[in-house]
Amino acid sequence: MEKGRIVLASASPRRLELLASAGVEFDVCASDIPEEPIPGEAPADFATRLARDKAVATAARTEGRWFVGADTIVVCAGEIMGKPVDEADAVRMLRKLSGVSHEVITGYAVYDRERDGLLCKAVVTKVVFKPLRDEEISAYVATGCPMDKAGAYAIQGGAAYMVERIDGSYTNVVGLPLCEVVEDLRRIGAL
């Protein structure tokens, strides 16, 4: 499927697995940018800004033609939830998500170094959690799984049973809206 050199600007094993599952050939070069929202920044703008910054920063330090950056956040009752800072934060996040609807937003960006072109989009999926008991939350947090996940959960892992329903892209909740990303890569000539 390769037409040019695509670089995934992410260390996320979930993004790597998703992109590879679509038959896309790519290299990986993790980006390291600050992930702090600007005061007043809308959640989708925050996620797409981080995705753009990851793609462009990676392009500045490695070879390639197209650079794909992505960032996933969870938004619940107006709070942007990134990765928990510690176990207590993970417990707090899961308690807040318990029994309510929230949004998972993944911003993604594709930077074309040759044309100096940039495509940025955000994909939103609505997720509803079942009401969670404190012992369920404690047991899940004790696994360590929530610690590197936005909103402190992985739909594809131990938290799958917590999800009553989703409206939108499942792969977006995992960390990369695969349908949209692959279609955009095709549309711009990367695939």
Curated annotation (Swiss-Prot):
InterPro entries: ITPase-like_fam (IPR029001), Maf-like (IPR003697)
Annotated CDD domains: Maf
Enzyme class: hydrolase
Annotated site, Important for substrate specificity, chain positions: R14, T72, Q156
Residue numbers annotated as active site: D71
Annotated GO biological process: nucleotide metabolic process
Protein keywords: Cytoplasm, Hydrolase, Nucleotide metabolism
Gene Ontology MF term list: dTTP diphosphatase activity; nucleoside triphosphate diphosphatase activity; UTP diphosphatase activity
Pfam hit, one: Maf
Subcellular location: Cytoplasm
Main subcellular location of this protein, as a coarse class: cytoplasm
Gene3D superfamilies: 3.90.950.10
Cofactor(s) needed: a divalent metal cation
Documented EC number(s): 3.6.1.9
A GO CC annotation given for this chain: cytoplasm
Reaction it catalyzes: dTTP + H2O = dTMP + diphosphate + H(+); UTP + H2O = UMP + diphosphate + H(+)
Family: Belongs to the Maf family. YhdE subfamily.
General function of this protein: Nucleoside triphosphate pyrophosphatase that hydrolyzes dTTP and UTP. May have a dual role in cell division arrest and in preventing the incorporation of modified nucleotides into cellular nucleic acids.
PANTHER family: BIFUNCTIONAL DTTP/UTP PYROPHOSPHATASE/METHYLTRANSFERASE PROTEIN-RELATED (PTHR43213), BIFUNCTIONAL DTTP_UTP PYROPHOSPHATASE_METHYLTRANSFERASE PROTEIN-RELATED (PTHR43213:SF5)
Record-given protein name: dTTP/UTP pyrophosphatase
Source organism: Geobacter sulfurreducens (strain ATCC 51573 / DSM 12127 / PCA)
